[in-house]
UniProtKB/Swiss-Prot annotation:
A GO CC term assigned to this protein in UniProt: cytosol
Any one biological process term the GO annotation gives: D-ribose metabolic process
CDD domains hit by this protein: RPI_A
Designated name of the protein: Ribose-5-phosphate isomerase A
Source organism (scientific name): Thiobacillus denitrificans (strain ATCC 25259 / T1)
Known function: Catalyzes the reversible conversion of ribose-5-phosphate to ribulose 5-phosphate.
Length: 218
């Protein structure tokens, strides 16, 4: 299977986890395949909560109801991709810039199902640059603090998040303890959040491989 075929396969497999209630939906190319597959069974769910404006637009284009997170309770499941994921279910996310809303929706969900092709499975996080969402006026301060943590932050030029903030992509971080690093970066004044999903990692990984979809659970 090609990488895109793997993404389509895991997206279809993830639909089995959307049995009813309100579903949280992630952002990115793999999540887009999930939205397309979800459209075929939209009658069995009550609605969705989107993690970005782009996701909301795609859901609505399929006639799938998009709800405000503040108007609903706990979500049944959150389905999203990852830029990297380990066998311990810690992830780097945010390549598409939606990390803050993704992290919020994930925190409000009973179950997190990660869908990815096998190129995203890694032994140690950090080859993919870690996105950090930052209040614009704090950009330089946060960058200096990230250098102290061993990283090389670079501004994502010409990009503004749905929340009106900027993204620093941090290269060359040694992410041996993702839970501790997630906490440390979030404590820097001016950081909204970072793309480490370790404190709230995935519960299920649907991994697309050349031989089909493999399922891993905590």
């Amino acid at each position: 299977m090609t990488q895109d075929e793997m993404k389509r396969a895991v997206a279809r497999a993830a639909v089995d986890y959307a049995k009813g209630g309100i579903i949280g939906v992630g952002t990115g190319s793999t999540a887009n395949h999930f939205i397309d597959a979800l459209a075929e069974v939209k009658g069995r769910i009550e609605g969705t909560v989107a993690s970005s404006e782009a996701t909301a637009a795609r859901l609505k284009s399929h006639g799938i109801q998009v709800l405000d997170l503040n108007s609903v309770g706990e979500l049944e499941v959150y389905v999203d991709g990852a830029d990297e994921i380990t066998q311990h279910f810690a992830m780097i996310k945010g390549g598409g810039g939606a990390l803050t809303r993704e992290k919020i929706v994930a925190a409000c969900s009973k179950q997190f199902v990660c869908i990815a092709d096998d190129s995203k499975l890694v032994d140690v996080l950090g080859k993919f640059p870690l996105p950090v969402e930052v209040i614009p006026m704090a950009r330089s301060h946060v960058a200096r603090e990230l250098v102290k943590l061993g990283g090389q932050p670079r501004l994502r030029e010409g990009f503004t998040t749905d929340n009106g903030n900027v993204i620093l992509d941090v290269h060359n971080l040694s992410i041996i303890d993702p839970v501790s690093l997630e906490t440390a970066i979030n404590q820097i004044v001016g950081v909204v959040t970072n793309g480490l999903f370790a404190r709230r990692g995935a519960d299920v990984l649907l991994l697309g491989t050349s031989t089909g979809v493999k399922t891993f659970t905590r």
